Amino acid sequence: RGVFDVLGRAAIALNTSVGDILSRTDIFAHGTTASTNALIQRKGARVGVLFTAGFEDTLVIARGPIGRVGGLPQSQAMDFIHTEPPEPIVPRDMVRGVTERVGSDGAIVSPLDETALRNAIEDLVENGAESLAVCLLWAFRNPAHEQRIGDICQEVAPGIPVSLSHQIAPKMGEFERAVTTVINAYIGPLTQAYIGDLDQGLSSDGLANPIQVITSTGGAARAATIGRQAVSVVNSGPVGGLVAARFLGDQLGHDKIITADMGGTSFDVGLIDGDTLEEDPRPFLDHGLPVALPAVKLVTIGAGGGSIAWTDGYRLHVGPQSAGADPGPAAYGRGGTEPTVTDALVVCGIVDPDNFFSGGYKLDPALSERAISSRIGEPLGMNLHEAAAGILE
């Protein structure tokens, strides 16, 4: 929706039509945080995971303390005693072990038990698996067993997407490879649906060529491949902003730039120092979720304009859940009743309700006030402005 809204406003500004703009467009590159938001809010697909038997707890054991504090701000990571374990994206009851074994040299030590495998796949599907991830020991040395499992998954559960670790992250590091593969399975269906709908909509409006999707490394990939490599486009929106900022900096003669990208769910900060973008070889996409794929370095927190403020009766919290764009903040007047960061900005006078989105959309301050007072102020014994200021702090 946001993409088409922007195209519509551009067409008005240029005194032309969206169709005319798209018909004259050779390359349409799109960056998105749809997959990032799904990961932060834990709103991805229900994933079933297949590990080598005996290693079913890889995601839980993680890599010791790194798996517990990785991805947290340094101040929290140093306070190890008071940190909470990261919220898993796959519940333990959706993990199964597969009898097989490949050695570190790639030699097959134990054959694959296909009968037990079929039973495990059927069990995961019966338990609601919408996507499957396969991560076997040393599969990047010899992918034969993973390839066979992929074939059997298609036989037993046709139509359910399968992510194989030797295809997603063929690198040493069992935990990171597993996390990367599981994340791909977790956000793959949503990302594919989003990109597919966007591509179809733009094509219907006159775009002749398939869209390209910005990747986490600052490059671009064809839309048709994104469903199979969804993890490669996490944070592609902010990364696209960094690429654009570098280009703009070149035009203006600046090579030291800090970028900030605030959306509905997250706030992303990037740094440009010179002509190159800093790369993180194994970034954390969220608390406890390192991936074995390089990416342009960003710092992301789960707080954006649509992040919902809530209370447990004792303390005020913000996020990670977001009201998104629809219904959005209460001030949008689209039926949203939860107080958000945007509502707090309206109440505190930081956002002008009459000039939101360059005056293209008017906000309703009364709805913001009602949401903050009823959900935050009254439960915590705070007046309206104290509650709004508390949300922003």
Describe each PLM feature range.
Residues 1-393:
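N-terminally biased helix-coil "hinge/interface" segments that flank
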